[in-house]
Regions:
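Bilobed "Venus flytrap"/periplasmic-binding protein-like clamshell domains
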Residues: 1-52, 61, 168-184, 188
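Ligand-binding clefts/hinges and TM-proximal coupling segments of bilobed small-molecule sensing domains
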Residues: 11-21, 101-174
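Alpha-helix boundary/interfacial micro-motifs
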Residues: 19-21, 27, 57, 152-154, ...
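Glycine-centered secondary-structure boundary/capping sites
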Residues: 27-28, 100-104, 193, 203-206
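Pocket-lining segment of extracytoplasmic ligand-binding domains
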Residues: 29-138
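An extracytoplasmic/periplasmic, membrane-proximal ligand-sensing/linker region
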Residues: 60-82, 87, 129, 138-209
Length: 209
């Protein structure tokens, strides 16, 4: 409280929406007791570099096994300045409180030291699962073909593009269940022999109402 906090735009889920929910409902931090600013990711990073804000939010990408991490370019910009970065983590109790409030399924994860630049100590973070399946309006045949097409090109894309580095069959199936996945997609996953991996993750759900 009482600090300058720079977040992403109000319409950006990971950069703006979720951090505001965490600040308000877990820490009691609101615009009434702190200087909360919403701006583009590039702008908030520059504010931290210039020393005109006290804290910023920086989402990172990961896969279900938490072995491959996608460090955003904005973190690399901060790293390039040579300035020391101080990470502010969250506890499992913090994330549990947020989940209870919004009927959500955020996950608490402890990052090992040196997962992120200048991270010398373990860091607790809240993980928001990116969840995607074939749209329910697709026919069974189209849903099947979409999954099969991705399964075919993904291994090569993993070698060609940094964003695909975190891809794995586990990434495609984490959070899926018979109830939330298109039947055509389920058929494809079963033929690929990947459906059994859904047991490694709890099914993705959304708040009711």
């Amino acid at each position: 409280k009482g600090k300058r906090i720079s977040l992403g735009l109000r319409g950006q889920s990971d950069w703006g929406v979720y951090p505001r929910l965490l600040l308000k409902h877990v820490f009691g931090i609101t615009p009434k007791n702190a200087d909360i600013r919403h701006m583009t990711p590039g702008a908030l990073t520059q504010q931290l570099i210039d020393g005109v804000t006290d804290a910023v939010v920086i989402p990172i990408g990961a896969e279900p096994n938490m072995k491959e991490f996608l460090i955003p370019g904005l973190v690399r910009r901060l790293e390039a300045t040579g300035k020391k970065m101080c990470y502010l983590g969250v506890t499992k109790e913090d994330i549990d409180k947020l989940n209870k409030k919004f009927q959500a399924t955020w996950i608490h994860v402890n990052l090992k030291p040196n997962t992120l630049p200048h991270q010398s100590k373990p860091l607790g973070i809240g993980v928001n699962r990116a969840y995607a399946v074939v749209h329910p309006t697709f026919s069974d045949e189209k849903a099947y073909k979409v999954v099969m097409a991705i399964a075919k090109i993904a291994p090569k894309m993993k070698e060609l593009h940094a964003l695909w580095r975190a891809w794995s069959p586990g990434l495609m199936t984490c959070g899926l269940s018979e109830e939330n996945t298109h039947p055509g997609a389920v058929k494809a996953f079963k033929e690929l022999g990947w459906w059994g991996q859904t047991k490694k993750c709890s099914p993705m759900t959304y708040p009711k109402g």
